[in-house]
Amino acid sequence: MAAGTAAALAFLSQESRTRAGGVGGLRVPAPVTMDSFFFGCELSGHTRSFTFKVEEEDDAEHVLALTMLCLTEGAKDECNVVEVVARNHDHQEIAVPVANLKLSCQPMLSLDDFQLQPPVTFRLKSGSGPVRITGRHQIVTMSNDVSEEESEEEEEEEDSDEEEAELCPILPAKKQGGRP
């Protein structure tokens, strides 16, 4: 590979990393981790409400994404109204009915990842159930700590970038005498 080509490739490599935010003293955003866990609860004549809470001390962002509500074995052919109690944009508690299930006409309802911020309370407002509520508990964590291993890798990367940048300059070709 010619020295000029190597210099051009080193420049392009350096330029693309700079635009991506990873070189030249630019701050790289904190790594984000996302975990997802199954969620489920059952409301019935014996258990008429369930509250989903998370620890307040936790710095992570929690989301409860509801996927489905369905009547389970032993349900009577009656209206089962499920209500969700949560907080609105003004942090005021509100109660909203989200499903009216009946065994003979609508035994289940898909909620298509209906997202709620905890704490959330589910109440069986009418009917005797049992009503099964399913979904996913999603936890998004932003890591502020950069491990020593990552710091060392970044330093090694910067050192190799500096070495690539210190390529020899392109010199003009020597004239060869005697050729017409």
Curated annotation (Swiss-Prot):
Coarse class of the protein's main subcellular location: nucleus
Family the entry assigns: Belongs to the nucleoplasmin family.
Gene Ontology CC annotations of this record: actin cytoskeleton; cytosol; nucleolus; nucleoplasm
Pfam families: Nucleoplasmin
Gene: NPM3
Keyword Transferase tagged: no
Subcellular location: Nucleus; Nucleus, Nucleolus
Any Gene Ontology biological process: rRNA processing
Oligomeric form and interacting partners: Interacts with NPM (via N-terminus). Forms a pentamer with NPM at a ratio 4:1 (NPM3/NPM). Two pentamers form a decamer.
Keywords of this entry: Acetylation, Chaperone, Methylation, Nucleus, Phosphoprotein
Species annotation: Pongo abelii (Sumatran orangutan)
Protein name: Nucleoplasmin-3
Sites of Phosphoserine modification: S13, S16, S147, S151, S160
